């Protein structure tokens, strides 16, 4: 982005002609194209697989959450005045919907939570009582008005993150999955531990402890395992070398 902005804006400051601006635009579009290609290459599956452990470590997520909390608080302190909110005379610049003083009118959708909390706190809904309470306890009412907004802002930013950036999705698979994978990938290693008796083996193979366990061992192995006995040459035990 910085490269695009520089390529597009820097020569236009010095040369005001249309030709230079068009050439700058071509430069900017080409830079954007190449940067998009580089980004696509950077976010390839191999790159993400390599650096996922670094990016999604617990320290990274902790610092990311801390940054989000601080930015949310900064945004709230900019948007909401420290004293009294909309009730104070030196309130924020942006216009807030005021509370309605009539009995029948409903509060607006933008200030529904704050106006509801204010109306529930005051039992008498007459216009004089509403105005007097808002004038007298402006500080407390402002606090009540601002706290739901703060909670909403924090929840809006923070709540979807644990579902997306959990470490559990990048964990090493469980022992059962690992065993299943290795049993299929390296069948001769699995065959060294559980093998059929000598009668069903090809002649000239090396003798092992599993050869002398009898036929019941072979039937048990056949029923329990999903992998047939491998036809690959078996690895010899170290005592037979």
UniProtKB/Swiss-Prot annotation:
GO terms for cellular component: host cell mitochondrial inner membrane; host cell nucleolus; membrane. A motif (Mitochondrial targeting signal) lies at residues 175-184. It comes from the Viruses. Residues 79-151 are annotated as: Disordered. Residues 79-100, 107-136 have a biased composition (Low complexity). Pfam families: Deltaretro_Tax (PF05599). InterPro entries: P30II (IPR008596). The keyword Electron transport does not apply. Changing residue 140 to G: In strain: Isolate LAF. A motif (Nuclear localization signal 2) lies at residues 91-98. Changing residue 149 to T: In strain: Isolate LAF. HTLV-1 lineages are divided in four clades, A (Cosmopolitan), B (Central African group), C (Melanesian group) and D (New Central African group). p30II is a multifunctional regulator that sequesters EP300/CREBBP and down-regulates CREB-responsive element (CRE) and Tax-responsive element (TRE) mediated transcription. Specifically binds and represses tax/rex mRNA nuclear export. Since Tax and Rex are positive regulators of viral gene expression, their inhibition by p30II reduces virion production, and allows the virus to escape the host immune surveillance and persist latently in an immune-competent host. p13II increases mitochondrial permeability to monovalent cations, producing a rapid, membrane potential-dependent influx of potassium. This could involve a channel-forming activity. Interferes with cell proliferation and transformation and promotes apoptosis induced by ceramide and Fas ligand, probably using the Ras signaling. This is Accessory protein p30II. It comes from Human T-cell leukemia virus 1 (strain Japan ATK-1 subtype A) (HTLV-1). The lineage of its organism: Viruses, Riboviria, Pararnavirae, Artverviricota, Revtraviricetes.
């Amino acid at each position: 982005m910085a490269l695009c902005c520089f390529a597009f804006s820097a020569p236009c400051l010095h040369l005001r002609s249309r030709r230079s601006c068009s050439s700058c635009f071509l430069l900017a579009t080409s830079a954007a194209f190449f940067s998009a290609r580089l980004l696509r290459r950077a976010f390839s599956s191999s790159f993400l697989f390599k650096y996922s452990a670094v990016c999604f470590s617990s320290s990274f997520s902790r610092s990311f959450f801390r940054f989000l909390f601080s930015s949310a608080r900064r945004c709230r302190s900019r948007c909401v005045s420290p004293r009294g909110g909309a009730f104070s005379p030196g309130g924020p610049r942006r216009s807030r919907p005021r509370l309605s003083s009539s009995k029948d009118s409903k509060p607006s959708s933008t200030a529904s939570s704050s106006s509801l909390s204010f109306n529930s706190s005051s039992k008498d809904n007459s216009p004089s009582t509403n105005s007097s309470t808002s004038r007298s306890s402006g500080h407390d009412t402002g606090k009540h008005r601002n706290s739901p907004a703060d909670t909403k802002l924090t929840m809006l930013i923070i709540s979807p993150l644990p579902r997306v950036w959990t470490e559990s999705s990048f964990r090493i698979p469980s022992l059962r999955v690992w065993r299943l994978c290795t049993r299929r990938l390296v069948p001769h290693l699995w065959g060294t531990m559980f093998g059929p008796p000598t009668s069903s083996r090809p002649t000239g193979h090396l003798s092992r402890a599993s050869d002398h366990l009898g036929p019941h061992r072979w039937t048990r192995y056949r029923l329990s395992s999903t992998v047939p006995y491998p036809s690959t040459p078996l690895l010899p035990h170290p005592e037979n070398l």
